[in-house]
Each structure stands twice: as structure tokens, then as C-alpha cells.
């Protein structure tokens, strides 16, 4: 028994020695053992003598998936007079749990949930007051609009309807960009619209009265900042802006802007128009903010046109409006006995109907309209 144990103990060292010898042999065959991973000291592998088989490129095109929007909170801020109807505003939060409203009655003598220090500067006083009072509790997105639901300066393809614009507005687009003018159509306001410090005889003074005072106002509002040679964005003082973008400017500056509005000798119309062409500079730093109309519609509202069809639509609409003008002129001059004029009116109306039919066909082919 003792001899067997002695043989076992003698065999263990021999076995260990054999294993060490074997690994030393392998090490000599495969290169030095790596004791640390210093990549720079590692020798480069020689190029393969036979090229590897390269997989064929996948030529199938996969369009990007739809943008997933998070449920951003939004507040619709409205400036209104007592007699203006804002029932359309009241109904919107009922359909959207992430939307609230703040309707400011600027000419009310009674206590109201939202009010302003003074009815001055049109919607500007409301917008600034809302930002000042809610600076630390803003929704993700603030939407600033006028009181009227249907108006000419709203978007054509949303039936000029403020409620439809709010419903279709894509929150992610505002969160990504910080600021969006709610009007997609460039005219009036873009491009090359207001030229501060121009001569008194300039056409700008006749057509854009705020051009005569905006240079002076700029110097008061932004002392030390050079006055841009031109200021442009689509009219008419309606926009959406993210909370992050608003807070890039200290609250104290908004207070100073409102103090300027309270103190300025400019009348309401002019002080409001001055700010109409300042908001975009304030929130984007761009003197001219004139996005491509089809991009605004598609990314801002989900209404996506073929650019050629978009241009064709407005070409046809221009022709239709010209004929409609002729009809109105003939109708104002015609008498019941004027058969020739009556026939001409009928002919023009028929052409107008045909053009409207073509416009409807384009709208029917456009993604997002009517949804």
C-alpha cells in the first residue's frame, strides 16, 4: 500500500513537467505568449493570399420608418377681445389630453383667469405676458395664435382653420427645430421683406409702414446688436416654440421687452407689426426665416405634396381667381337685358368650375389632406 502511494506522489511532478513541456512546445510554434494587450506592439497579420468572398451589397431600399412622437404637452395661447368667439379653442383640449389653453381677454374690466397689464401692442402683450408668468412652468410647446378660427392668413390646405392647424401640428417638428411659423405660405412676409433704415420715399414705407420704425425699435430692444439689413418671415404673428427655446433667453429679457411695449410711443398697429418680424430672430437667430412651403406642410402638418403638383395647384388657382374677378366685374355692370354679358358670365363660371375640379384632383392625390 505504501509503495503504491509513493509511486503516486512521484508520478504527479512528472505529469506536471510533461504538461509544461507541451505548452512550451505550442508557444514556440505560435509565437510569443502575450502577457499584456498592448495593441501597438502586436505584429500586423500578413495579407491573406486568397481574397475572402465579399458578400453582395443589399440594393433593396428601405424607406425610413415613421417618426415616433412622444406625447409632448402643449399650451394654446390666445389673444382675444371680449366680443370675439373662441368656442373653437374650448373644444380642442377635449380631444387632446396633452393640450391646455390660455385665453387672454385683453379688454376685460372684470377679473379673468388670464389678463394683461395693458391692452397694447395687439397680440404681443399677451404672448410676452404668458411667457413671463409661466416661464418656469411652460408646457413642452407653446402655440401662440389669434382668436379667430377662420382667417385668410391661415393655411390654404387646412381650410384656413385654426383648429385644424392645432390638431395637425406635429409636436416633434417643433421639439426638433425649436420654432415654427404656423403659416406655411411665404407671402406676405418672404423673402426680402423689411429693410430697416430706408429712405422716406422708398416703396417699403408705402407698402410696409413698420419699415420706417423698426430700425429705431431694434436699437431700443437689442442695444449692441447690429440691425439686420433685411428681416423676413411669413406673416402674421402666429407661431409655436418649444420651452427649451424660450428658456434660452433669461426671463428678465422678456420683462424688458414688455416694458418697452408699455412705454413705446408707437401705436398698437405699428408696435405689433414690429414684433411680427422680430419673433423669428429672437427664437432662431435668423434675420430671414423663409422655410420651403412644402417642407412646412409635410414636416409641420403631415400634408406632403409632390413639389411639381404644389406649384401646379397654385398656378391653376391663380387662373381661377383671375376669372372669378372678371365674373364679379361683369356682374356689377350687367343688366337683366344684357344677354351677351350673361352668356359670358356663364362661360367664365364653367371654366372656373373646371379649374376647381383640377385643384380638387391634386388635393385628392396629396398625402395627408382630409385626414
Residue spans for each PLM region:
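ER/Golgi luminal nucleotide-sugar-dependent glycosyltransferases, focusing on the catalytic module
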Residues: 2-371
Amino acid at each position: 500500500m505504501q509503495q503504491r502511494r509513493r509511486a503516486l506522489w512521484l508520478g504527479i511532478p512528472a505529469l506536471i513537467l510533461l504538461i509544461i513541456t507541451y505548452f512550451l512546445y505550442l508557444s514556440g510554434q505560435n509565437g510569443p505568449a502575450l502577457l499584456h494587450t498592448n495593441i501597438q506592439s502586436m505584429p500586423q497579420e500578413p495579407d491573406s493570399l486568397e481574397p475572402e468572398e465579399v458578400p453582395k451589397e443589399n440594393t433593396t431600399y428601405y424607406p425610413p420608418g415613421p417618426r415616433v412622437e412622444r406625447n409632448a404637452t402643449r399650451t394654446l395661447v390666445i389673444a382675444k377681445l371680449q366680443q370675439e368667439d373662441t368656442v373653437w379653442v374650448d373644444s380642442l383640449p377635449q380631444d387632446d389630453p396633452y393640450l391646455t389653453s390660455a385665453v387672454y381677454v385683453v379688454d376685460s374690466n372684470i377679473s379673468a383667469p388670464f389678463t394683461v397689464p395693458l391692452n397694447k401692442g395687439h397680440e404681443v402683450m399677451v404672448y410676452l405676458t404668458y411667457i413671463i408668468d409661466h416661464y418656469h412652468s411652460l408646457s413642452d410647446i407653446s402655440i401662440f395664435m389669434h382668436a379667430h378660427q377662420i382667417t385668410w392668413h391661415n393655411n390654404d390646405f387646412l381650410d384656413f382653420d385654426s383648429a385644424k392647424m392645432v390638431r395637425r401640428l406635429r409636436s416633434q417638428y417643433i421639439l426638433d427645430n425649436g420654432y415654427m411659423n404656423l403659416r406655411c405660405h411665404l407671402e406676405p412676409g418672404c423673402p426680402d421683406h423689411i429693410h430697416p433704415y430706408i429712405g422716406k420715399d422708398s416703396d417699403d414705407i408705402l407698402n410696409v409702414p413698420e419699415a420706417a420704425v423698426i430700425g429705431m425699435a431694434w436699437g431700443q430692444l437689442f442695444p449692441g446688436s447690429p440691425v439686420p439689413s433685411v428681416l423676413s418671415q411669413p406673416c402674421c404673428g402666429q407661431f409655436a416654440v418649444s420651452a427649451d427655446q424660450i428658456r434660452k433667453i433669461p426671463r428678465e429679457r422678456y420683462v424688458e421687452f414688455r416694458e418697452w411695449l408699455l412705454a413705446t410711443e408707437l401705436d398698437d398697429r405699428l408696435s405689433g407689426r414690429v414684433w411680427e418680424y422680430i419673433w423669428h430672430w429672437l427664437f432662431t437667430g435668423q434675420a430671414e426665416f423663409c422655410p420651403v412651403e412644402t417642407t412646412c406642410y409635410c414636416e409641420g402638418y403631415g400634408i406632403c405634396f409632390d413639389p411639381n403638383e404644389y406649384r401646379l395647384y397654385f398656378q391653376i388657382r391663380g387662373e381661377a381667381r383671375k376669372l372669378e374677378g372678371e365674373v364679379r366685374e361683369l356682374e356689377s355692370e350687367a343688366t337683366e337685358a344684357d344677354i351677351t354679358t350673361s352668356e359670358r358670365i356663364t362661360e367664365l363660371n364653367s371654366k372656373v368650375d373646371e379649374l376647381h375640379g383640377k385643384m380638387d384632383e391634386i388635393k385628392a392625390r396629396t398625402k395627408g389632406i382630409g385626414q
